[in-house]
Amino acid sequence: MNGKYKVPDLSGIGQEPAEETLAHCEIVRIDQYRPYMKPVAGFSSSGNGDLRTIEMAARKAMEFVRYATGLRREEARLSQLNIGLKCGESDTTSGFASNPAVGVVTERLTSSGATIMFGETPELTGAEQVLVKSFEKDELRTEFMKVYKSYFDFILSQGVDLLGSQPNKGNIAGGISTIEEKAMGNIQKIGRAKIHGILDTAEAPREPGLYFMNTSSAAADLLTAMAAAGAAVQLFTTGKGNNVGTAISPVIKICANRETCENSAENIDVDISGIIYGGSSLLSGADAIMECMARVCSGEYTSTEMLFHEEFAPTRLFPQS
C-alpha cells in the first residue's frame, strides 16, 4: 500500500444538528467535541472493566435522553440547511429522472443560500471532463483534476481494476452498460449549479454553496462522511433499491423506478416514478423531494430511521492528498 493512506477525521459528527448529545465508548479525545457546545461524555474500559463501563455509559445516556427530550425545534428555512447527496444501486431511471430531479433541488437551494455536498470520486470516471466545467474558478478546476487523478492512481496502486468492477451487476441489470454512462447519470444530481469548493473526506464547508467532497463511493462510507461534515439531511437516489442509512442524519430515499417503488415501498420516501411513466415532471418531482425534506426536518421519520438502518462506516483506506 506504499504507506500512502490516511484515516479521515470524523470529529465533525459532534456538530450534526440531529444529535443533541454525545457519549463515546471508544478511543477518542473528548475535547475534540467540546467546541460544538453539546453535553459530551467519554468512557474507557481500561481500569473499569466492560460491565462497569457499560453501566456508566447507560446511566449517562439516560441523563442525556432526559436533556434531549427537553429541547425544542427552531424554525428555519430549507436554504439554511447543509445537505448531502448520494446515489446507490443506480439504473437508467436514476440518470433520466431521480438524479435530474435532485439536480433541480440543488439549483433551487444553492441559489437561495443552502450548502450542498456531493462526492463519489471513483464513480465520476468518464464524466470528469464534463464535471470540471461546473467549477466556479480555474484554480478549482485544476485542483479537482489533481484530486481525481490522485484517487484513480491510488486505486491502480492497490492492484484494483475500477473499469472491471464498474458498472456492477445491479447497474447492468438496470440498463447501465458502461462506467461512463453511470458517471454521466451520477453528476445529474447537481444540475446546472456551479461548484464553489472542494472538500476532503468529512471536511465541513466553511460557507454556503455547492461542494465536491473527495470520497469513496461506498454508501455507508459516504453517508458517514457527509454526516461528519454537518449534513442535516441526505438525499439518496436509487433505482434498484438500496437500504443503507445512518444513525447520525436522516437519509431520504428517492426512486423513479416503478417496480422498485412497488416492491420495496417501505424503503422509499419519495416515489417520483411518474417522471418516467407519465403524470409528473422533473419540476414536480423536485417539489415532492423538497416537501419531503421539509417534513423530515420538522420531525417526520424517514424509512431508514423507521427500519433502523443505522450504518456507521469510517473510510478505512484513502489516498494521501
Question: What is each residue range found by the language model?
Answer:
Residues 1-30:
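Flexible C-terminal active-site loop/helix
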Residues 6, 39-41, 115, 211:
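Conserved beta-strand segments of alpha/beta enzyme cores
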